[in-house]
Regions:
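N-terminal [4Fe-4S]-dependent radical SAM core
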Residues: 7-77, 90-97
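Short glycine-enriched, charge-decorated loop/helix-capping segments at active-site entrances
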Residues: 67-75, 171-177, 245-254
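Conserved AdoMet/S-adenosylmethionine-binding subsite of the radical SAM
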Residues: 89-93, 97-100, 105, 109-236, ...
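Auxiliary Fe-S-binding modules of radical SAM enzymes
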Residues: 9-42, 196, 201-279
Length: 279
């Protein structure tokens, strides 16, 4: 191919030595986007451009974004991967060597076609990609699994939320089983995809030594864990439940104390997972 030959992929025209805008030549994949945070610092390495997708099947009692549950919520914005990537690149100078794009939710895997489109185009121009997921949509059945395999080719890191290690307690906390969630954790280990395990610590729901010990044992079976994070429960999203006319299920439950947070970190051996410092 000559140096001047161009390849059109949607919004961008790629040419050796540069990136140029072009007219759309194919029908773009459209995603339902809840919101965007242009300068995130806790959802992946470095400074992140965070895309919050619409839609989630779980009904976590501690959810601080219940307005993301309905995938076709009329308030959601219709965005293409090219559109989102163009906006993200406005902030590229802040990312440094480790920053990039994180897609969260809601549950982004419910819109896996959009994810593939966005992450593929991001990787073609050298942008770091992180997926923040609870894993509930995961299945080995087709066509999802083939799509997920492709998505992983363009994903640098997975932020993986394990809400509760006990299946019955997980159902009580989220309304869903964790069977396929744990299967996804094992699969990500099998393909050696870097993950950060995240666990929301909720008094009287997930903050029990018995379940933390079981979670610790499970994490130790995985070979790809670069970091383990404790996310203390908070009530900042309570007002959204009230605005939506929903009863807040954790009424009267306060955030965990510093002692309980320290206890959870000790049981999960969070200080032993330092792989993220080497990447």
């Amino acid at each position: 191919m000559s140096h001047d030959k161009k390849i059109q992929r949607g919004f961008f025209t790629y040419k050796r030595g540069g990136l140029f805008m072009s007219t759309v030549t194919e029908q773009p994949i459209v995603g339902n986007v809840h919101s965007i945070e242009s300068f995130g610092s806790v959802d992946g390495p470095g400074v992140r451009f965070i895309v919050f997708m619409q839609g989630c099947r779980m009904r976590c009692q501690f959810c601080h974004n219940p307005d993301t549950w309905k995938i076709n919520d009329p308030k959601a914005k219709k965005r293409t991967a090219d559109d989102v990537l163009k906006e993200a690149l406005n902030y590229k100078s802040y990312w440094g060597k480790k920053g990039g794009i994180t897609v969260s939710g809601g549950e982004p895997l419910l819109q896996i076609d959009f994810l593939i489109d966005l992450f593929k185009k991001a990787k073609e121009i050298g942008v770091n990609t992180t997926l923040d997921s609870c894993g509930k949509p995961f299945t080995f059945e087709e066509p999802f699994f083939s799509k997920f395999e492709e998505l992983m080719q363009y994903t640098d890191l997975v932020l993986f939320d394990i809400k509760q290690i006990d299946d019955q307690k997980h159902k009580e906390l989220t309304g869903q089983s964790n069977d396929n969630i744990l299967e996804l954790a094992k699969y990500l280990s099998d393909i050696n995809k870097p993950v950060w395990i995240r666990h929301v610590l909720v008094p009287f729901r997930s903050d029990y030594d018995e379940y933390l010990i079981r979670l610790d044992k499970f994490i130790k079976t995985l070979k790809n864990v670069d970091k383990v994070e404790i996310l203390p429960y908070h009530t900042m999203g309570k007002y959204k439940w009230e605005e939506m006319g929903l009863k807040y299920p954790l009424e009267g439950i306060e955030p965990p104390t510093d002692d309980r947070i320290a206890n959870a970190k000790k049981i999960l051996h969070t200080e032993e997972y330092k792989g993220y410092l080497k990447r």
